[in-house]
Amino acid sequence: MRFLFYIIVFFLQSICLFGQEKSFHFFRYNDETKSYTKDFEHKNLQSTLDSLQKIGYYTLTIDSIKNENIYLNKGKLYQTIWVKNNETFQTKNDYFPTNNLDSILTKISTENTNQGYPFAQIKIIPKGFENNEQKIELVLDKGNLRTIDGVKLVGYEKLDKGYIKHGLNIKRGEIYNEEKLSNISSLMNQTNFISEVQKPQTLFRKDSTILYLYPEKVRSNYFDGVLGFGTDDNGDFRLNGNVKLSLNNVFNGMEEIRLNWIGTANKNTSLDIGVKIPYLFKSAIGSETTFKLFKQDSVFVNINFSERLFYQLNLSSNIGVSGIVQSSNFLLDDDSFLKTSYDDYSKIGVGLSYNYFVKHPFRLMEGKSYLNVLVNSIRKKEKNFSWTEDIENKTVNQYEIGLKTYRLFELHPKHFIKGTVEFAGLLTKDDDFSENELYRIGGFGSIRGFNEESITANMYGIASMDYRFVPNEAFYIGLFADYAFIDNKRANINTSLLSFGTGISFLTKMGIFNLSYAVGKTEETSFDFKESKIHFGILSQF
């Protein structure tokens, strides 16, 4: 009888393959009326019959077939069935009850698919009845174990192999895992350097399994120019600027090359150059080299160099160790008064750091989430000018801690809040610092409403809150407020700063246009709109 049942099903499906796709009309036999009533329609006969059996119609039979009309006798709907225990379940009893066989079958199929058996099949074998309840046995045929034998790139064939292995976590020879492969698209979307033309596909051959990826290299280089208007310490009108250049994935190694130049209203100049290579020799080890130069007018010049080796935990985060070399030279040797505040020194140190970043799908947004934590141990050798003797050599130990984090929250469609916290501290036993080793904050990138790098401190903290109304992906207007505290042991200053302002950002053919207006105050001063700062710039992608 069962053999005849499958013959009928096969015959019906064969007819459908050569004809126009039609819907089957299923009629159910009613024991009370002794007649058939129309039950439902479906285009796939076999899947319909399988579904009915899975939900509990285990005695289902086909009474007759007339064209597209299928006359069924569903039989009894078994709410509870007893499944025979075997190596698949490993329970204590010979049989165990269930009222959701479909979920069991789905779970078994999913587990095997993610363990290298994508073609695993489960056979339901009836084992009779007990107390009017169905007893069955599930027999699992796993098939052959599948492993990833190769990755084929279609489109961007020079995609870095280290990124494939450690960024996308695809390793040749690993066991096939469908759940893991389904996350590849979301992983690709976490970088700005590539896009996905279509979803990954898997080619199953008799003796091999090949994964096909469809990446596309995108333009990800940036030029960002910001021009600021304000006044210097004498109240005179001054221009200041900030130029950023970012070259990304130029050599197809997912590398980042950045240059940042800042010129302030007080004739200070800083240059920051960095090179980041995330997958050295196709490994999960990366390198980040940083060179910084700061010159305060003609008074002194600082040079900082650091080399950071990091381990890529995943696409979003890494942990690293750094080597640090710093030096500073006082340029006005004939100025004895200034020489007491500025020391020649050299520093060497090591540090630990952790970095986490998740991009936001909107191009206007800096990112969705960011966290950077660092701890450095530094040994400083300095040459101090003394009124009693010309040079006084001194060696001290210092510790540096830093934190910067932000998070973008979507309060409601089109309404976003960005919260930012930044902290940095340079610590030493005697709290004795040189003027030329202090942090310099202020301006568009830190606390808005003040001149670029016009505030010095050995410890500071900044908390910012931005509200943004984003009607579409290409435009937003916002309000912001910044609060900061500074501690300057050198000048014996401990105070707080406050600023607020508004800004606008939108996409143009040239790039992203930014315009902001901010005004700030200290504990000793009030808001003076004559001292307000205006910044505008264009972030161009090429």
Model-derived segments and spans:
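Bacterial Sec-dependent N-terminal signal peptides
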Residues: 1-23, 542
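Periplasmic polypeptide-binding modules associated with outer-membrane biogenesis and secretion
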Residues: 20-231, 242-244, 258-268, 272-274, ...
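Transmembrane beta-barrel domains of outer membrane proteins
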Residues: 141, 214-216, 246-248, 276-278, ...
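Repeated loop/turn-to-beta-strand initiation elements of outer-membrane beta-barrel proteins
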Residues: 194-195, 221-223, 250-257, 281-287, ...
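C-terminal transmembrane beta-barrel domains of outer membrane proteins
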Residues: 240-244, 258-263, 272-274, 369-542
